[in-house]
């Protein structure tokens, strides 16, 4: 009995020690650390020019992709990968270590307590949250609210970080940020200065904007990337069934990049999605709809949220799919100050 208690105490002490050590570790290791491992500075610069700024990000690329970088031979890539493996651990870890790692995940408030409760605290980092629904259901309004709440300190359920916003539909309104910032007692000018914004016009432009984010996120404390919407440009640039396979392949590459950004820099990715008619939705559902993007998008999103219009000016958010959340729903309201709890 005593031996069992001592073993349990020892185990708990080890967990505490590992947790304390883990807090001291950086979220990612900069790519220039490869130089200390014997990698030529010129080769490190080539990696940076290709959009790879951390050793963590390097390990998320295939050797085939790396040899596609001008000036990097197969032998050089092998040497670079071996050096990176000495700096970052991309192998197995125990379940306890995985639990400790999960503690670095930040939950960003949506501005609505009911919605936060539904999501287990808010929009989480190191994950992709997809919000889909018809127009005027509140997806973009939540995006604008998150632009502000992400910058709140962590003791106010914020992310204490900057915001990156990629707009594919031309719906971002900086003047909308002002009353939301005022609601949370923040300086609107400072809030806007902490948002980097880009308007994408083609799916290629959208992908290139993602590639350029790595350099910024490795230098500054970003906490969320918003893409509004993920599918719009693909539906415009690829038309007809003949281009569907190519579209889905390009979409998969885009989503893979988003997953890597989320995990590499511990940022939340919030992306909106459109809906399409669902002919197989059933005769008992009026006007059945499903999210656009097919299985490719469905498998990439960590958390999928269905937004719909409720009674009057209320909106409803339902957990459509999530690994750790119950299938439930919550009501919210769109106010001058952003997303808020619905009035009874």
From Swiss-Prot:
Gene3D superfamilies: 5' to 3' exonuclease, C-terminal subdomain, P-loop containing nucleotide triphosphate hydrolases. It comes from the Eukaryota. SsDNA binds at residues 235, 238, 241, 247, 315. Its main location: nucleus. One of its GO terms (molecular function) is DNA strand exchange activity. Residues 1-22 are annotated as: Disordered. The keyword Transmembrane helix does not apply. It is found in: Nucleus. CDD domains: DMC1. The keyword ATP-binding applies. DsDNA binds at residues 235, 241, 247. ATP binds at residues 133-140. Keywords: ATP-binding, Cell cycle, DNA-binding, Meiosis, Nucleotide-binding, Nucleus. GO terms for biological process: chiasma assembly; DNA metabolic process; DNA repair; meiotic cell cycle. GO terms for cellular component: nucleus. It holds the Pfam family Rad51. InterPro entries: AAA+_ATPase (IPR003593), Dmc1 (IPR011940), DNA_recomb/repair_Rad51_C (IPR013632), DNA_recomb/repair_RecA-like (IPR016467), DNA_repair_Rad51/TF_NusA_a-hlx (IPR010995), P-loop_NTPase (IPR027417), RecA_ATP-bd (IPR020588), RecA_monomer-monomer_interface (IPR020587). May participate in meiotic recombination, specifically in homologous strand assimilation, which is required for the resolution of meiotic double-strand breaks. Mediates interhomolog recombination during meiosis. Double stacked ring-shaped homooctamer. Interacts with BRCA2A and BRCA2B. Belongs to the RecA family. DMC1 subfamily. This is Meiotic recombination protein DMC1 homolog. It comes from Arabidopsis thaliana (Mouse-ear cress).
């Amino acid at each position: 009995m005593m031996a069992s208690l001592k073993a349990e105490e020892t185990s708990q002490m080890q967990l505490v020690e590992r947790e304390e050590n883990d807090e001291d570790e950086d979220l990612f290791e900069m790519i220039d650390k490869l130089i200390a491992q014997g990698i030529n500075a010129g080769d490190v610069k080539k990696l940076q020019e290709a959009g790879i700024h951390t050793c963590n990000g390097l390990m998320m690329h295939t050797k085939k992709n790396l040899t596609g970088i001008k000036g990097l031979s197969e032998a050089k890539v092998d040497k670079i990968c071996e050096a990176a493996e000495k700096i970052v651990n991309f192998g197995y870890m125990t379940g306890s270590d995985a639990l400790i790692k999960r503690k670095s995940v930040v939950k960003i408030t949506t501005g609505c307590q009911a919605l936060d409760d539904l999501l287990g605290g808010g929009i989480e980092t190191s994950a992709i949250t997809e919000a889909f629904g018809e127009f005027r259901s509140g997806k973009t309004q939540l995006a604008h609210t998150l632009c502000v709440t992400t910058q709140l300190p962590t003791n106010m359920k914020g992310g204490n970080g900057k915001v990156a916003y990629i707009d594919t539909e031309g719906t971002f309104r900086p003047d909308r940020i002002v009353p939301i910032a005022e609601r949370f007692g923040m300086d609107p000018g400072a809030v806007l200065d902490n948002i980097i914004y880009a308007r994408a016009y083609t799916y290629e432009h959208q992908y290139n904007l993602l590639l350029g984010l790595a350099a910024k996120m490795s230098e500054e404390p970003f906490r969320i990337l918003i893409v509004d919407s993920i599918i719009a440009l693909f539906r415009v640039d690829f038309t007809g069934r003949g281009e569907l396979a190519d579209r889905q392949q390009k979409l998969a590459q885009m989503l893979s990049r988003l997953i890597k950004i989320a995990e590499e820099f511990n940022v939340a990715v919030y992306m909106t999605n459109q809906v399409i008619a669902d002919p197989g939705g059933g005769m008992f559902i009026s006007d059945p709809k499903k999210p656009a993007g097919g299985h490719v998008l469905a498998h990439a999103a960590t958390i999928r949220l269905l937004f719909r219009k409720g009674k009057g000016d209320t909106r409803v958010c339902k957990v459509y799919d999530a690994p750790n959340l119950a299938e439930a729903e919550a009501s919210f309201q769109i106010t001058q100050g952003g997303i808020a709890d619905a009035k009874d």
